[in-house]
UniProtKB/Swiss-Prot annotation:
Source lineage: Bacteria, Pseudomonadati, Pseudomonadota, Gammaproteobacteria, Alteromonadales
Keyword list, A-Z: Ribonucleoprotein, Ribosomal protein
Start and end residues of each stretch annotated as Disordered: 1-22
GO (cellular component) term, any one: cytosolic large ribosomal subunit
GO MF, one example: structural constituent of ribosome
Pfam (any one): Ribosomal_L27
NCBIfam families: L27
Gene from which this protein is expressed: rpmA
Organism: Shewanella amazonensis (strain ATCC BAA-1098 / SB2B)
Family indicated by similarity: Belongs to the bacterial ribosomal protein bL27 family.
PROSITE patterns with a match to the protein in the record: RIBOSOMAL_L27 (PS00831)
GO terms classed as biological process: translation
Name of this chain's protein: Large ribosomal subunit protein bL27
UniProt-listed SUPFAM superfamilies: Ribosomal L27 protein-like
Origin: domain of life: Bacteria
Length: 84
């Protein structure tokens, strides 16, 4: 005869895998065309000069150069550009 009451079950104990979002190349870093600069959900950062934007809003370099982050416009948007 068991002398311990059966334990209850739980509906917790799960978590999703991290998506590894964020800035991959910082301001002043050299990049080659095609390098990913920022992985993001939505446009937290906007594409500036020589920067392309992917289907999932990933920003990537269109040319070789140095990464430049800047805040501009009436809404203080963050832009990422590539300078030669």
């Amino acid at each position: 005869m068991a002398h311990k009451k059966a334990g209850g079950s739980t509906r917790n104990g799960r978590d999703s895998e991290s998506k590894r979002l964020g800035v991959k190349r910082f301001g002043g870093e050299s990049v080659l065309a095609g390098n990913i600069i920022v992985r993001q959900r939505g446009t937290k950062f906007h594409a500036g000069v020589n920067v392309g934007i992917g289907r999932d809003h990933t920003l990537f370099a269109l040319t070789d150069g140095k990464v430049k982050f800047e805040v501009k416009g009436p809404n203080n948007r963050k832009f990422v550009s590539i300078e030669d």
